[in-house]
From Swiss-Prot:
Ion transport found in the keyword field: yes
Stored Gene3D superfamilies: 3.40.1380.10, ATP synthase, gamma subunit, helix hairpin domain
CDD domains: F1-ATPase_gamma
Homology family: Belongs to the ATPase gamma chain family.
Gene: atpG
Keyword entries, A-Z: ATP synthesis, Cell inner membrane, Cell membrane, CF(1), Hydrogen ion transport, Ion transport, Membrane, Transport
Function (record text): Produces ATP from ADP in the presence of a proton gradient across the membrane. The gamma chain is believed to be important in regulating ATPase activity and the flow of protons through the CF(0) complex.
SUPFAM superfamilies cross-referenced by the UniProt entry: ATP synthase (F1-ATPase), gamma subunit
Recorded GO CC terms: plasma membrane; proton-transporting ATP synthase complex
Entry-linked InterPro entries: ATP_synth_F1_ATPase_gsu, ATP_synth_F1_gsu
Subcellular location: Cell inner membrane
Name of the protein described by the UniProt record: ATP synthase gamma chain
Topology with respect to the bilayer: Peripheral membrane protein
Membrane-traversing stretches: none
Length: 288
C-alpha cells in the first residue's frame, strides 16, 4: 500500500501547485487591465511631444540639434527592459536572444556596447556577457512604475551620448501586441529618425516661444526620450503579465493532465492490489 500512498501524495501535491498557478493566473489577468490602461494613457503624451518637436524643428532650420544628426558609429548604447520576476514563459529569453544577435554584430565590427538595464532578470544574464559594459541598473520598479524611477537611467545614457561616448541609442523591450502575443522590439531612440509625416513638407504657422525655441526644444527632446523609455517599460509590464497569465494557465492545464494520468495509474495499481489479495484469500481457502 506504500506505493498507493505515494501516488495519492503526488496527486495532492500537484493539486496544491495547480491552485497556486490558478491564483497567479487570476492575479495576472487583473494586472493586465491596469497595465494596459497605463500604456494607453502614456502613448498620446509621447506622440504629442513628438509633434511639437517636429513643429519647432521645422521653424528653426538654421539650428539642428545633435539628437537629429547621424554620427560615425564607434559605440552604441541600449536601454534593456526586462522583468524583475520569473514565471513569465520565454519573455526574457526571446528578448535576450534578439539582443545577443545585435551584440555579436556590433562586436564583430569592433564597436563598444554600453547598457542601461531595467529589471533584475536582464541584469543577471547580461553581467556574464563580456562584450558589453553595464553603466546603469534599475530594479524593483513594481507593477505601477513612475517616471522618477527611470530618470536616473535616462540621464546617464544621454550624458554619455552628449559626451560622444555613445553614437547611437536603442531601447530593447517586449512590445505588447495582444494578450496572446508579445514581440521582442529594438527601437532606435537616438539619433531621432525623421517623422514620415514631417511638418517640413507642408505649409504651417508658427508660435511665439518664451523662452527661446532652442531652449524649449532641448527640454522637449529630453522629455520625449524619457517618455519613450517609460512607454517601453509599461509595454514590457503588460507583456510580462500576459506571458505570466499564459504560463500559469498552461501549468494549470498540464497539472490536470498529470493528475488524470496519476488517477488512472492509481486505480490500476489499486485494482491489481485487490486482485492479488483476493487471489491469496482464495488460495488460502482452497488449501484449508
Amino acid at each position: 500500500m506504500s506505493g498507493l500512498k505515494e501516488i495519492r501524495g503526488k496527486i495532492d501535491s500537484i493539486r496544491n501547485i495547480q491552485k497556486i498557478a490558478k491564483a497567479m493566473e487570476m492575479i495576472s489577468v487583473a494586472k493586465i487591465y491596469q497595465t494596459q490602461r497605463r500604456m494607453l494613457i502614456s502613448k498620446p503624451y509621447a506622440e504629442t511631444i513628438r509633434k511639437v518637436i517636429d513643429h519647432i524643428s521645422s521653424g528653426t532650420l538654421e539650428y539642428k540639434h545633435s539628437y537629429f544628426l547621424e554620427r560615425k558609429i564607434q559605440s552604441v548604447g541600449y536601454w534593456v527592459v526586462s522583468t524583475d520576476r520569473g514565471l513569465a514563459g520565454g519573455l526574457n529569453i526571446n528578448l535576450l536572444k534578439t539582443l545577443l544577435y545585435d551584440f555579436n554584430k556590433w562586436s564583430n565590427e569592433g564597436i563598444t556596447i554600453r547598457l542601461a538595464i531595467i529589471g533584475s532578470k536582464g541584469a543577471s544574464f547580461l553581467r556574464s556577457i563580456k562584450q558589453t559594459e553595464i553603466v546603469s541598473c534599475v530594479y524593483g520598479i513594481g507593477d505601477a512604475p513612475k517616471m522618477s524611477a527611470l530618470i536616473g537611467s535616462v540621464r546617464v545614457m544621454l550624458q554619455l551620448y552628449d559626451n560622444n561616448q555613445i553614437d547611437r541609442l536603442y531601447l530593447a523591450y517586449n512590445k505588447f501586441i495582444n494578450t496572446l502575443t508579445q514581440s521582442p522590439q529594438i527601437l532606435q531612440i537616438l539619433p531621432i529618425i525623421s517623422s514620415k509625416n514631417s511638418i517640413l513638407q507642408t505649409k504651417y504657422w508658427d508660435y511665439l516661444y518664451e523662452p527661446d525655441s532652442k531652449v524649449l526644444l532641448n527640454s522637449l527632446l529630453q522629455r520625449y526620450i524619457e517618455s519613450q523609455v517609460y512607454q517601453g517599460v509599461v509595454e514590457n509590464l503588460a507583456s510580462e503579465q500576459s506571458a505570466r497569465m499564459m504560463a500559469m494557465k498552461t501549468a494549470s492545464d498540464n497539472g490536470e493532465v498529470i493528475i488524470n494520468d496519476l488517477k488512472l495509474f492509481y486505480n490500476k495499481a489499486r485494482q491489481t492490489k485487490i486482485t492479488e489479495e483476493l487471489t491469496e484469500i482464495v488460495s488460502g481457502a482452497s488449501v484449508i
